[in-house]
Curated annotation (Swiss-Prot):
Belongs to the endoribonuclease YbeY family. This is Endoribonuclease YbeY. The keyword Nucleotide-binding does not apply. Keywords: Cytoplasm, Endonuclease, Hydrolase, Metal-binding, Nuclease, Ribosome biogenesis, rRNA processing, Zinc. Its main location: cytoplasm.
């Protein structure tokens, strides 16, 4: 079973946001051929908290829109086959304040921006990155393909 553990540190998250992200990431999981027995967490925070996380864990003292912590990122390959435990992908942290600002700046809905950020974080958990131009092209192309196939367009 694909499990997403949500946490709202803002007190402002609407139930519809949980449903949207859950449905989108379930769709993305299938598109990326991730096994059903996987889990991750999504946490909603404000600007102050995401800046603190960014400073503490990434040594960047600034506000950002989304941060991902992939559990498998720096770990050597561990074979869990045959064990009845889910694959833990990691954590996605989304700043809802920045999501709203970016939606306004880009001229699309908050829901589209929230979906974009959740998917962006999810792809990072799967190993996608945008440190090089080629990696960025691959990751952003994949994001656009999944968002468009899901029906969450820039319009």
């Amino acid at each position: 079973m694909f499990t997403i553990d949500f946490s709202d540190h803002t007190g402002l998250v609407k139930d519809a946001w949980y449903k949207q992200i859950e449905d989108l990431l379930e769709f993305a999981k299938k598109e990326e051929h991730i096994e059903d027995d996987a889990e991750l967490s999504v946490t909603f925070v404000d600007k102050q908290e995401i800046q603190e996380i960014n400073r503490t864990y990434r040594d960047k003292d600034k506000v950002t829109d989304v941060i991902s912590f992939a559990l498998e990122e720096d770990e050597p390959e561990i074979d869990f086959s045959g064990l009845d435990i889910p694959r833990v992908l990691g954590d996605i942290i989304i700043c809802t304040d920045v999501a709203q600002e970016q939606a306004n700046n880009y001229g699309h809905s908050f829901e589209r921006e929230l979906g974009f950020l959740a998917l962006h974080g999810f792809l990072h958990l799967l190993g996608y990155d945008h440190m090089t131009e080629a990696d960025e092209k691959e990751m952003f192309g994949r994001q656009d393909t999944i968002l468009n196939a899901y029906g969450l367009t820039r319009d």
